Amino acid sequence: MKNLLSMEALTVHEIEHLLEQAAQFKHGKKATLKEQAFAVNMFFEPSTRTHTSFEVAEKKLGVEVVSFDAATSSMTKGETLYDTLLTMEAVGVNVAVIRHSEENYYAGLDKLNIAIVNGGDGCGEHPSQSLLDLFTIKEQFGTFQDLKVAIAGDIRHSRVANSNMKVLKRLGAKLFFSGPKEWFDDSYLEYGTYLPVDEIVEKVDVMMLLRVQHERHSGTEQFTKASYHEKFGLTVERAAKLKQDAIIMHPSPVNRDVEIADSLVESEKSRIVTQMTNGVFIRMAILESILKEQEMRAKVCTY
């Protein structure tokens, strides 16, 4: 794997391999990188989980982390992302993890040799989050085939939803969507069925909630926190109707008592904290896969 830009770029075999490697890391597998490697985490949007878990993953692998602050970089002087990455490549950085507000920011960067891991591109995709979600689901159920998965909330503005709806259908899951119609697009019906939240909770094995992304809204939405929770959120009353073995997921950050009741965030059915933990192991698997391929290419070139 040279880069990780979108879930669509991964084959089912590659996905299964990454999930297996993540499971091995979780059960104590040690890193097997042979050469010194450097990574830079370039975040142009706020991030807690993605940024910190990539950094922890890098350090667990023995990868040196190069500091980068967009606000103090030469990009404030007009330097392009391409030229910034060209610089990183020139000084010996192997992989760049990038979070950017612009969708498809990585278009045109394929000429570079530095590997790119998409840490989220606007409302586009979030492949490492999608992979950790798959890892969490597989840990619980062992399979994706015929699982009923609900994706509920601010779907239109969610890069997580974009990644997950495509890959879950490809892996054999049955998808349901719910949330405000204003934040839904009929193009999603290619992947699943739209239903009101009260018609979904009793059906599904996985209740995947999405944050209300106020920063991406036009300001015309009419929901208060309380009214959103009442109409569309996972309330305590709705959660009581979930199947006995159903799980609750959320990519975080969580708006408590908006998309999910406060008391449910750390409840028995919740896998929200588990998702965060699993994020380190899946990101270790992603980085190891990329860096091992670089090692292999370098070895071939020396003969």
Curated annotation (Swiss-Prot):
It catalyses: carbamoyl phosphate + L-aspartate = N-carbamoyl-L-aspartate + phosphate + H(+). GO terms for biological process: 'de novo' pyrimidine nucleobase biosynthetic process; 'de novo' UMP biosynthetic process; amino acid metabolic process. GO terms for molecular function: amino acid binding; aspartate carbamoyltransferase activity. Carbamoyl phosphate binds at R49, T50, R99, H126, Q129, S252, P253. Coiled coil: none annotated. SUPFAM superfamilies: Aspartate/ornithine carbamoyltransferase. Pathway: Pyrimidine metabolism; UMP biosynthesis via de novo pathway; (S)-dihydroorotate from bicarbonate: step 2/3. Disulfide bonds: none annotated. One of its GO terms (cellular component) is cytosol. Its EC number is 2.1.3.2. Heterododecamer (2C3:3R2) of six catalytic PyrB chains organized as two trimers (C3), and six regulatory PyrI chains organized as three dimers (R2). Catalyzes the condensation of carbamoyl phosphate and aspartate to form carbamoyl aspartate and inorganic phosphate, the committed step in the de novo pyrimidine nucleotide biosynthesis pathway. This is Aspartate carbamoyltransferase catalytic subunit.
